Each structure stands twice: as structure tokens, then as C-alpha cells.
């Protein structure tokens, strides 16, 4: 008898962990299949979570009751708020993570998760029912020829589809060092007529920290009283460690340039496109030829692990070149190299093949998440996995509901919209600059933006829903008080505030918005607020400082939502729309946007083309 589940998630990386737990939370009987349980939660590249844009995604995952933020807080050994000197909208929390502790925490979480079964099995194929109008994926088959049936399947294969690693001319099949590759799933994806491409990523060598000379290197400490990723952080902060900063130099660059012909990236050996914002050191020397130095951040991999990750010198150069290059860097003259850096090529699916739910347009019941969608990064993968898992569960449970987020809801909405309307020609990485409504999409208010949506979708548990409701009530009460209470200029002056003596009374919220006014100042003037929660006070301070800008951005969002409200029928025939060139028709047919707003964001689409679509759709509805 076939093993039957509501949802099957293939892969135990960051996307798979979030997809499996999200599907289980939403009420689906869920199976996570991974080739090795001991590798669940593995951090394959850098030992860090968060950063600019990425920290926002972790907070959004947490707001939807995902697991990454809580697991990161259990394993964080250094916290830093990036862009601390800038506005709240562009600040990003980043943490160095103890790899072993993170992996252990994630495995413990998943192996005891309600509604979730975890089994070992290398998935080699999809079970496809082609009897209907559209193919439907109804299960998977493992290498051991064990079949599993499900109403929804979520693929989170990471770099494992036809994974090929490069160190100089040496090639090794695998999705990660000392790991296997999945050789047959791509064939099933192509059988479903999904467009498959090739991308590349890379990682630096790993170093023995005991053999590094830190004496002349710049120390980079973490923050003493750090913020945490999770709104639910209730675990003690671990002992915190320092990173160190060194740099390449002209000798390093001379070694690399003398061996550039041996670099797989430039010899024609690698065909996949790498991430623009995380280039290899050999790529940096080509793109920034005028620079004679690049920073190298020495990041510890754990509290009881001497391994160090040299962030900034990712490479696939031959081992002898890596050896000479690394030993030319200050502090690393006598370092022992534990293992060399490498590049990895892998298959991905053109993300314009997906709906906003992350289900494929050409096959029912098949959802894709993570690097398989053309992204790079743990945080991007985790966020996509969560949304795919929720929608896979909603479909399997036949709820007739979908869980989607748009560009005004969160960074996850921005990322999905970018992927499904623009596609990718290089691995996609999240930045705050990608979000046009970033003043409203701050990391501090991720729960206020998203948790209720998660409650409505069914993916937020009772404990978090209750905590969110309590915080929202406290926030609404304090905000209402600040907006209702007023003080005259004379009263404010007597309280120590510097104000214009125009006679105009000011609300508490307006006073809080004054430059250099702190929450402590407000409490002195309005003692009723003395017992306000710290997280509520922080959010009100930010709202007050930004209130003029926020009102303008809310007006922009209203206009955006108007375009998003106009749905384009799935079966629309773009060839019948007058005035569209063959090229524009081809672009529309490739993406098949779900809304007028999405149509306007497709690369190469003119306002005139959008107007033509609008007129045609309106006529269809008459």
C-alpha cells in the first residue's frame, strides 16, 4: 500500500524546513523527505543569518510563526544591527550563527513537530497524472523505489539538481561538499514543460582558527544588548564572540591574476551565472580592476569549533592557487586550510513559471521554493518555503483559499512579485532597495503587518496568535491615547520641550515626532504611558518620527492596490488584443501576469500595452 500524505516536502534545507513546518501548522498531514536527516538545517555556506533586507525576511518568517528566527536566536553567537546610524526602514539585524547548534535546534524542532513526519529518502522522480486537462503531480518516488502519494508536493531541492562542484579543473558531482546530487528530477520538470536553466554559486575555503594570527587584525565585536530575530525570543543569549577583519593586497591580486586562465569561471568550464552581489574573488578582480584591496571578514563557525569562514574570498581556483592566495593575506600567513573553496552549478526553474502561491502554472499540485526558484540565501529560501508550504496545505485540504502577499504587504511579497513577473538571469538576493514601500515594511512591525494574515490563513499557532493580539491591543491603546491627548505650547515648554509658541495645541503623537524627543521624555509629559511595553514604545517612536512620510506612502499603496485589484483571466489570448507587438505578446504569454499591476512590472512592457490590456479585460467583463 502506498504511503499517503496531504503534503510532501522534498529537501531538508532552509526552504524545506519552513515549507514542512508551515504545511503542518496549517493542518496538513505532512511528510518531509530528505536524503539524510542529520543534514537538516545545514548552513552550507556562511555561518550567518540576516543582514540588509534579509533580516526583514527573517522577521517576516517569524511573524508568520515560522522557525528560522527562533532557531537563529538559539544559536546566535554575535548580533549586529547593520545600518544602525540610518533610519529604521533600512536597518537589518544580522547574527553569526553556531552551525552545529543551529542544525541541532532545527532537527529537534522538526522531529517533534505536530502533524509532521520526517523520513530519509533520496527522491528521484515525480508521480504525474496526465489524464486531465493539465498534468497533476500526485506524489514522489525515491531511489529505493518507494512511492509516496500526496495532494501537494513542494520541491525544495536547493543546489542538488544536477549539482556539479568545481575546484580548478577538478569537477565533482554533488549538491554540496561530501554530499550527493539529484540526477533525475530535472527530467520530470522538463517533462512538465517547465523552463529549466543553470545557475552558479560558490563558497570560500575553511580555515583553522587556531593557526590565524589575530594580533594585528581589526576586531569586530557584536552588540552588548542586542535585538533578537524572533518576536518570541525567550531563550538566553549565548556567549558572544568577535569577528576579525583583514584584507587582500597587491600580492594576493598578483597571484590570482597570474592564474586567471585556470579559473573555471573564465576558462569556459562553468556555464551557470553567479550571484552579482556575492562575487568570487576572481570575479571581483575583473569587475573592480582598479582596486588593490578587498575586505575579508573572518567569521567563527561555532563556540566549540575552531573553523573560520573567510567571508569575501569565495573562489573556485585550483587548490595550489587558493593556498598561495590565502597565505598572502595578513594574519593568514601560517593558516591551515581545512578545505578549499569551490563553485557549484545547479539547475533551477524559471520563476515566471509560478503563480503568486508558488504553485507551477503548468502542473497542479507542484510547488517550488528556495534556490530552485532562482534565489540565493538562507533567508530568501526560508521565506519562499513558508509561503509554498502554507499554499500546498491549503490546496491539499481543499479549502479554496490561497495565501498570497503583495509588494505592500512585505519583503516576501516584493520577492515573489519580482520573481514571477521579471524572472531571473542571475541568483536573486533581497535588498531593502527592492521595496518601494520600505518605510511601512520595517522589521520592527513585521508582526503587525503579517501575523493576522497568517492567523486568517491558518499557519499561526494559538500561542503566537494570543501574544500578537495582546501586543496589538497594547499598541492600539497607547497610540489612541497619544493621538487623543493634547498639550498647549506653554505646558510643553514647562515640561522641557522646545516648541513654537504659536498657541497651537499638539497631540502626544506629534510631540513624540519632534526631533530628539525620546520615549522617556514623553513619559515625563504623559505619565499614563509609564507602563508601556518596550516593543510597543519602540514602534510608536518610529511611527511618530515617520508619520508624514507614512501618510504619503499609504496614498501610494492605495493607488498600487487599485491596479492589483484588476484581475487578468488566466486563459486570456494576448494575440487578440489590438495594438500589441509580437514581442509584447511573447512577454505577456511567458509570464501570464495575474493582475494589471503585475503586467505593468514585466520588463519591456510599455504603459500603452498595459492600457490595451486594461481595455480588453474590461470589454471581456461586459
Where are the model-predicted features located?
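Beta1/beta-strand and adjacent pyrophosphate-binding region of the FAD-binding site
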Residues: 3-15
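Core beta-strand elements of the Rossmann-like FAD/NAD(P) dinucleotide-binding domain
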Residues: 3-5, 143-152
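Short hydrophobic core segments
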Residues: 10, 147-158
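Conserved N-terminal/central alpha/beta ligand/cofactor-binding core
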Residues: 21-127, 156-176, 180, 184-186, ...
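An anion/pyrophosphate-binding glycine-rich loop and adjacent beta-alpha core
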Residues: 36, 186-323, 421-505, 509-515
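Conserved beta-strand-loop-beta-strand element in the redox core of flavoprotein oxidoreductases
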Residues: 127-146
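A glycine-rich dinucleotide-binding beta-alpha-beta segment and adjacent secondary-structure elements
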Residues: 309-375, 403-417, 533-587, 592
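Extended, charge-enriched "interface" segments that sit outside catalytic cores
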Residues: 434, 440, 451-605, 609, ...
